Structure formats: structure tokens, C-alpha cells
Amino acid sequence: MENVRLSDIENVSRNELNSSKLDSLENGYDSFETQLNSRNNPIALDRSSWSYRIINGRHRVFLARQKGYSSIPAEFV
């Protein structure tokens, strides 16, 4: 996994996300930090465009931006 600047990743709009999944990420058994750094379910990105396209992890990317993170761990596929 690499640390990737959020400014290099495509934007995610709240209206395209599932509210219950966002709630689960924020209030679930595992902390958001644990879920963000998950090696079993990593955030996956595609490098093929000028901003990295999200393959997996849209909800986590959205919340990381909301929480003020500047970078996140991700894998490129």
C-alpha cells in the first residue's frame, strides 16, 4: 500500500453514497482509522486518468476528506 494525497483522488459526492454505510464506518465496531488502514479490504485506485479513480473504498475516501485527512493508504490496481 502507498500513501496517496486525497487531492489526487477523484471527488466523491455525498448523494452518491449509502448513508447507512457511512454511519457504520463512523460508528461501527472498528474505528474509522482501523477501517481506513485495512489490509483485508484496502482502498483500491486506478491510475489511468489525471485523478485516481476509486475502484473500492468510496465511502472511506469521502469520510477521510470530511475528517480533514490529507492522505490515505491505498493500493493501485
Could you say what each language-model-derived stretch is?
Residues 58-71:
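Short active-site loop/helix that positions an aromatic residue
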Residues 1-55, 65:
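Short alpha-helix boundary/capping and kink motifs at helix termini
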Residues 73-76:
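A short hydrophobic beta-strand segment most commonly corresponding to one strand
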